[in-house]
């Protein structure tokens, strides 16, 4: 990742959308629309949103057999699938604030972690200004 990459991305048109709480499928559909818009030359997008009801979002390739469907039904937890990879993420109605950052792939570093760090740096800076000690996890996952 270079400073040129960060500078070029900062000079592009961006929009910030603060969404209301919505159900999981709608939040994922809005992320997909934002991605398609950026890919078609539209603005890059930062969305901040909440989930209603509480939702378990599955990674794109995650096996649905890993879900405790009975528990989700008993607790009123919706289940949806993200367009991105990784494992399941629980989004609580009362305690979860989510965000998505969308920009064309060609404008980002080729390495996934470099892109992640580039896009997350402003978030860490904002937490720092709020007095919150936030950083990347340095220990490998079990």
Report each predicted region and the residues it spans.
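Active-site loop/lid in soluble adenylation, ligation, and acyl-transfer enzymes
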Residues: 2-74, 81-82, 106
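Short secondary-structure junctions
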Residues: 16, 79, 134-136
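Short Gly/Ser/Thr- and Asp/Glu-enriched loop/turn motifs at secondary-structure junctions
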Residues: 51-53, 94, 137-140
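Short, conserved acidic/polar surface loops in the N-terminal third of protein domains
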Residues: 68-71, 90-95, 110-111
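Residues forming anionic-ligand binding surfaces in small-molecule and nucleic-acid pockets
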Residues: 83-106
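Catalytic beta-strand/loop module used to bind and position nucleotide/cofactor moieties
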Residues: 105-142
């Amino acid at each position: 990742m270079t400073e040129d990459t960060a500078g070029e991305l900062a000079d592009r048109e961006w929009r910030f959308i603060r969404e209301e709480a919505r159900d999981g499928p709608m939040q994922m559909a809005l992320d997909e629309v934002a991605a398609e818009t950026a890919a078609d030359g539209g603005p890059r997008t930062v969305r901040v949103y909440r989930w209603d009801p509480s939702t378990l979002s599955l990674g794109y390739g995650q096996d649905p057999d890993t879900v405790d469907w009975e528990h989700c039904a008993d607790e009123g937890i919706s289940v949806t699938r993200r367009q991105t990879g990784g494992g399941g993420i629980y989004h609580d109605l009362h305690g979860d604030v989510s965000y998505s950052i969308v920009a064309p792939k060609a404008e980002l570093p080729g390495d996934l972690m470099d892109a992640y760090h580039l896009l997350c740096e402003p978030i860490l800076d904002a937490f720092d200004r709020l007095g919150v000690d936030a950083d990347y996890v340095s220990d490998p996952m079990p």
